[in-house]
Amino acid sequence: MVNFYGDSIGEKVEDGDKVRTERLFTESKEIPTVKVSDLPSGYKVLQIPEVTERIGEYRNKFLKYYERTYVKISEYKARKKNELDDRVQYLKKNIFVDKYENEELLAPISLLGLGAFFTGRILTNPTNWGYGALLIKGQPTFFGMFMSSVPARIILPIFLAGYTFNKFLPVTSSKFVETCERDVLPKNVTKAIKDSKRQLYTEGLVNTRKTISQAVYRNCEDAVHRVRMSIAEQLDKW
């Protein structure tokens, strides 16, 4: 360790720099000690130990912070990659199970379903029913008010897209509905939907079909009875 104003250092400094340096440190109350290191190339390295030690501490802290941050980012990326892989495998296992639909129909039907969705959006756009006077001018009709209502604007595009997928991708659509009922919707909601479907099917379709069948059967009986009576009357006349 040598003093900054040692002869070995002063000899290497030009006069102008020497005067400037001496003036700088003579104004300070404490003169720091400077460490001189000789390099094999002949250059000398001047450093203040206190400053070098402080910089080393900052460097070590920065390296530790960088390492911790790098490890956390790597763990986060690995965790997200595993989650994405799990979700892809879940979709393949539960929804996209039909190989033919996945390879041949999924891409074109997806575009067709997107087109059906935007068709529904166009059909329910208020500006197309007299509100903006683009296609149909004048006061909106009742049908136009119905088509441009908020429920229609929400339900019709989804219905058209869902119908398209259900028509051309029956296996994928049915698996999607089953997966949503099993893993997404609450149990009570799923039960209510199934009960409503069962009630609609039993009280609606089945009972209606039964009523129509009974009416047709009675009408057939009446028609046959009238035909028989007519034939009997004709025979009696002969």
Swiss-Prot record:
It comes from the Eukaryota. GO terms for cellular component: mitochondrial inner membrane. Keywords: Membrane, Mitochondrion, Mitochondrion inner membrane, Transmembrane, Transmembrane helix. Disulfide bonds: none annotated. The chain crosses the membrane at residues 104-124, 142-162. Residues 1-103, 163-238 are mitochondrial intermembrane. It is a multi-pass membrane protein. It is found in: Mitochondrion inner membrane. Residues 125-141 are mitochondrial matrix. Component of the MICOS complex, a large protein complex of the mitochondrial inner membrane that plays crucial roles in the maintenance of crista junctions, inner membrane architecture, and formation of contact sites to the outer membrane. Component of the mitochondrial contact site and cristae organizing system (MICOS) complex. Belongs to the apolipoprotein O/MICOS complex subunit Mic27 family. This is MICOS complex subunit MIC27. It comes from Candida glabrata (strain ATCC 2001 / BCRC 20586 / JCM 3761 / NBRC 0622 / NRRL Y-65 / CBS 138) (Yeast). The gene is MIC27.
